[in-house]
Amino acid sequence: MQKNDDLLRERRKDEHVALGVKQNEQLAPSSLEDIQLIGTSIPRYNVKDIDLTTTIVGTNVPFPLYINAMTGGSRHTKKINAELAEIAREVAIPMAVGSQSAALKNSSLIDTYKIVREINPNGMILANISPEVALQEGLRAIEMLEANALQIHINPAQELVMQEGDRSFSHWLTRIEEYVKLSPVPVVVKEVGFGMTRETVKTLADIGVQTVDLAGKGGTNFAQIENDRRRDQAYDFLLDWGISTGQALIDMQHQDAPKIAYLASGGIRNPLDIVKALALGADSVGMAGQIIYSLKKEGVTKTIEKLELWKEQLRGLFVLANAKNISELKTTPLIISGELAKWGALREIDLVKLANRK
């Protein structure tokens, strides 16, 4: 039985990658398109003046992008993790591995995650677990990677669509609080593409969580992935569940939103999307599906070249926004329009204040 469970987990990991790559073949419309930065025609800064440095859980990083959690736990995904680690090392960006549950249950799979630290010995690596994982096991996940931080992913919608998924969630908050108090490294609580509301973020902040990844809808859709894995595809009605990255970001502009650090991910497509997310308060921006898609289609070298180009393009966008660094960018005026503006108004976000920031 144990062997069958291991095989099922390995197959699921491979299916996640294959279906995720397929989803990223065509970029979906993004709620970030409803966000417009108000720039300048007389910039104060030169491109060489721009400082893209940011901080993630107390660690300074030179570029506000990270490779978000996606994979590990099978022979095939070991190769992908190795290539992602090479990209992270060369571009000097943090990287999170996918859920390490498989390796915690089957030690023969540890190397499919550990390869990340072997290839990127000095980089910022985030371990990744579910709130289902008991503390001692979670500490093993951190040790496995010599991780700099721990991602705890919260994914009730995915679990409910997954036939073999969890059905009990009421203990999650207590478990997360235990990690916050006892983890030897900082904790980041992240969604998996269904987005966090300000109420969810407040619930987490109240137990001591200091950083969240809002991880909105718009990128890799794990409800669809799990539904596609089902023979009956019985959860078609849930494929649009959640809030988008744009919605999650403007929700954090509400006067009652908790004042904690947040990251943004979910449907990030280009440097302009990154700038919009940073301008709405994110400290850094995560990508998973698009990077794996680029890796699969173009290889490691081309993906590195693409991300290096993004650095230069990002500096240019900061110039246009009249911002020398991320702190200044967070005061750039923004116009929210379309469906995102309607949603924001119903959530009582002061869109006029956003449009006239200084």
From Swiss-Prot:
InterPro entries: Aldolase_TIM, FMN-dep_DH, IPdP_isomerase. This is Isopentenyl-diphosphate delta-isomerase. Its main location: cytoplasm. GO terms for biological process: isoprenoid biosynthetic process. Homooctamer. Dimer of tetramers. FMN binds at A69, M70, T71, S99, N128, K190, T220, G267, I268, R269, A288, G289. Keywords: Cytoplasm, Flavoprotein, FMN, Isomerase, Isoprene biosynthesis, Magnesium, Metal-binding, NADP. It is found in: Cytoplasm. The keyword Flavoprotein applies. It is an enzyme of class 5 (isomerase). GO terms for molecular function: FMN binding; isopentenyl-diphosphate delta-isomerase activity; magnesium ion binding; NADPH binding; oxidoreductase activity. Its EC number is 5.3.3.2. Involved in the biosynthesis of isoprenoids. Catalyzes the 1,3-allylic rearrangement of the homoallylic substrate isopentenyl (IPP) to its allylic isomer, dimethylallyl diphosphate (DMAPP). Substrate binds at R12, K13, Q158. The keyword Magnesium applies. It catalyses: isopentenyl diphosphate = dimethylallyl diphosphate. It holds the Pfam family FMN_dh.
